[in-house]
């Protein structure tokens, strides 16, 4: 197995939380041998859930995309930050102003979005990050609305060799302008990981569950570290050399591998 460090930490793994974009695929391209690796992982009896901060499209469209790429998975195995945001909106009875792309807005079609808005929900919405939309959000926040950041990633892998801005900078801009702190519902919020762990029946044994991702902060920081998950970084997607020891990293990953397939190789041959 090439390009792996920390191979020994996977020996006791019985469950795995998998990031999607940048880890299993980059846009419409599957990372090396990821489809076959997922099948091998299932064959080894490892429990799997997919945890993603993808917010540009609805959960149903995301599921269709993944199956179209060749991945075999159940719709109920996918936990999205978009879904977590909708749950929060429902629980609190918010009438949200949604800074989301049109395909993601589909998921909120049954939610009352009338004014006055009681929350501003921000996801990855490149077409909405202009002055008009941001100022409308600013005005709603000044009027008393809560700020909900679906996640706060700084950037994502648009292509293997090209990064693009994530929603984090835009959430931070609204925080700065209004002196409000955003509630974050996706990775790395602890409660987001707990949703998936509970569904797996492994909330009480996080030490035998690995979190796999390409972002040392958004995937492997925060709640992943607090819960004691085995944190495994892949050198695909948004990963750049030295990420694992960056200035904002509070604890380095437990292992670093070239690809998701390399992690699976280490798990099934342990």
What are these regions (language model features)?
Residues 1-20, 26-44, 55-79, 83-270:
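Asp-based, Mg2+/Mn2+-dependent phosphohydrolase catalytic module
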């Amino acid at each position: 197995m090439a390009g792996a460090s920390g191979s020994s930490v996977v020996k006791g793994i019985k469950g795995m939380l998998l990031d999607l974009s940048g880890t299993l695929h980059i846009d419409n391209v599957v990372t090396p041998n990821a489809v076959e690796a997922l099948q091998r992982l299932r064959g080894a009896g490892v429990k799997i859930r997919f945890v993603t901060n993808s917010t540009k499209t609805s959960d149903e469209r995301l599921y269709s995309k993944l199956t179209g790429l060749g991945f075999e998975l159940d719709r109920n195995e996918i936990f999205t930050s978009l879904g977590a945001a909708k749950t929060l909106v429902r629980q609190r009875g918010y009438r949200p102003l949604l800074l989301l792309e049109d395909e993601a807005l589909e998921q909120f079609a049954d939610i009352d979005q009338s004014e006055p808005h009681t929350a501003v929900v921000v996801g990855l919405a490149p077409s909405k990050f202009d002055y008009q939309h941001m100022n409308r959000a600013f005005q709603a926040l000044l009027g008393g609305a809560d700020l909900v950041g679906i996640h706060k990633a700084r950037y994502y892998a648009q292509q293997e060799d090209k990064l693009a801005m994530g929603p984090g900078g835009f959430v931070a801009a609204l925080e700065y302008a209004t002196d409000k702190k955003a509630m974050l519902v996706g990775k790395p919020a602890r409660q987001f990981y707990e949703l998936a762990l509970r569904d797996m029946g492994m909330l009480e044994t996080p030490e035998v569950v690995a979190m796999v991702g390409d972002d040392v902060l958004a995937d492997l920081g925060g709640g992943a570290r607090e819960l004691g998950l085995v944190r495994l970084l892949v050198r695909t997607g948004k990963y750049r050399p030295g990420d694992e020891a960056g200035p904002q990293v509070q604890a380095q990953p437990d292992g670093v591998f070239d690809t998701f397939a390399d992690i699976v190789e280490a798990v099934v041959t342990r």
